[in-house]
């Protein structure tokens, strides 16, 4: 990965976290290790409906459009 890719992923994760903060009132623990992202402590089922749509590596870092 080059530096530009890391910046894009960083910005994506920032938007990702802010996006969840708006739709989820419970506290989420997001831990990133390697290429896997583990999210725990969320009781909102909306999280699990949206999560598959937000996988950056499956969609070429494209943000979801509502």
From Swiss-Prot:
The keyword Hydrolase does not apply. The keyword Transport applies. It comes from the Viruses. Coiled coil: none annotated. Residues 1-2 are lumenal. Residues 24-66 are cytoplasmic. It holds the Pfam family TGBp3. GO terms for biological process: transport of virus in host, cell to cell. The chain crosses the membrane at residues 3-23. Keywords: Host endoplasmic reticulum, Host membrane, Membrane, Transmembrane, Transmembrane helix, Transport, Viral movement protein. TGBp1, TGBp2 and TGBp3 seem to act together for cell-to-cell propagation. TGBp1 is the main movement protein that physically cross the plasmodesma with the viral genome. TGBp2 and TGBp3 would facilitate TGBp1 function. Plays a role in viral cell-to-cell propagation, by facilitating genome transport to neighboring plant cells through plasmosdesmata. May induce the formation of granular vesicles derived from the Endoplasmic reticulum, which align on actin filaments. Belongs to the Tymovirales TGBp3 protein family. This is Movement protein TGBp3.
């Amino acid at each position: 990965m080059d530096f530009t890719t890391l910046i894009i992923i960083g910005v994506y994760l920032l938007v990702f976290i802010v996006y969840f903060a708006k739709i989820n009132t419970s506290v989420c623990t997001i831990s990133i290790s390697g290429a896997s992202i583990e999210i725990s402590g969320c009781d909102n089922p909306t999280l699990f409906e949206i999560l598959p749509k937000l996988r950056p590596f499956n969609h070429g870092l494209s943000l979801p459009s509502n």
